[in-house]
């Protein structure tokens, strides 16, 4: 099935980004699961998140350029040196992940926000011919929307830190290598 369509038709570079994103998502899930089971203090969680973010950055999941419309209208995006790319990527991945985790306090809020963001990412990804990002965002949107049915008030199931870390990281990672204005990678 993998080679008959979908991800099997993507370029090997995109395949690497997909696997790196999914490996990072699994690692973030495991950090969150460990927090759910053992009530980790914030510093070990943050250290683990930064380590995983650095690892996926080394595999190509990175913010390589920043587009400032008021500054780069004619010049295009500003390419970041590796040190700034690493810093921007780590702040983005860890920041979005923790933002989604903070939203998980109310029934349906984290999954609803992440689902809406993923649907928007699907639309933008496919309109820019970013098929790999579109497929991953569509899968994430489907997960969120399927979960929401059981997570509305009164919630019957809960995402926990593992689920919210997975959602946040996957959303942030797909956005970091997925749709970029004017690109057709």
Language model segments and positions:
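"…together with the soluble PPM/PP2C metallo-phosphatase catalytic core" -> "…together
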Residues: 1-185
């Amino acid at each position: 099935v993998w080679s008959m369509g979908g991800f099997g038709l993507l370029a090997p570079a995109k395949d690497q980004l997909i696997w790196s994103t999914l490996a990072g998502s699994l690692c973030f899930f495991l950090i969150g699961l460990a927090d759910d089971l053992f009530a980790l203090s914030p510093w070990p969680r943050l250290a683990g998140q930064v380590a995983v973010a650095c690892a996926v950055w080394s595999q190509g999941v990175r913010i390589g350029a920043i587009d400032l419309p008021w500054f780069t209208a004619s010049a295009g995006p500003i390419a970041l040196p590796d040190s700034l790319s690493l810093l921007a990527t780590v702040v983005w991945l860890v920041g979005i992940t923790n933002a989604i985790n903070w939203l998980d306090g109310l029934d349906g809020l984290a999954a609803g926000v992440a689902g809406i963001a993923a649907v928007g990412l699907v639309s933008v990804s496919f309109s820019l011919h970013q098929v790999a990002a579109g497929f991953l965002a569509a899968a994430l949107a489907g997960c969120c929307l399927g979960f929401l049915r059981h997570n509305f008030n009164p919630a019957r199931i809960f995402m926990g830190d593992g689920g919210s870390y997975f959602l946040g990281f996957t959303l942030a990672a797909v956005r970091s290598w997925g749709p970029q204005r004017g690109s057709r990678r």
